[in-house]
Amino acid sequence: MKRVVIYYSLNGNCEMVSEKIAELTGADVLRIEPLKSYPDKGAKKFIWGGKSAVMGEMPPLRPYEFDAKKYDCIIIGFPVWAGNITPPIRTFVNDNLESLKEKKIAAFACQSGSGADKAFKRLNDMLNRDKLDATLVLIDPKDRPKSENENMIKEFCDKVELLQ
């Protein structure tokens, strides 16, 4: 089964997790980036990011290459912003909705507090699915003990490997 990890990362948490998942599963990796970057520090980070997430914004993305026909399983990774998927991921899903319909979809979320379950539900709703095929929630993975994160990521990858 051919896989791809598609992610957005503001502070490197989702990037770190994406690289580990790709290493363990042999997945390709695609980083999604908005044309205009979000602030990554201070109050502006939370105000602009939270507003953009809550308002359901879909910012234009930097050009990327993605051919869904090449993949059986799509793994989507994002930080949780105000209980939502991040706007760049929302744009990607919206732009590729038809090509994602028949795929196995797994997702992981990195957060500092809570809201991942709501974000997964919103992703499900966007994809018109009952549920995702596998999910993983990590709290500040760059700051947590490495072995704990690695065990959780490995368990997630084991679930992804079982998807047929």
Q: What do these predicted regions represent?
A:
Residues 85, 116-120, 149:
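Conserved donor sugar-nucleotide recognition element shared by glycan-biosynthetic enzymes
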Residues 97-100, 129-130:
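Short helix-capping segments at alpha-helix termini
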Residues 131-164:
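Glycine-rich phosphate/pyrophosphate-binding loop and the adjoining helix
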Residues 88-93, 119-123:
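Short alpha-helix in the alpha/beta-hydrolase fold that links the catalytic acid
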Residues 1-76, 83-85, 91-94, 101, ...:
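N-terminal beta1-alpha1-beta2 submodule of the flavodoxin-like/Rossmannoid cofactor-binding fold
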Residues 76-77, 107:
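Redox-cofactor binding/interface segments in oxidoreductases and associated redox assembly factors
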Residues 11, 36, 81-83, 112-115, ...:
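Solvent-exposed loop/turn segments at secondary-structure junctions
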Residues 106-139:
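Short, glycine-/small-residue-rich phosphate/pyrophosphate-handling segment
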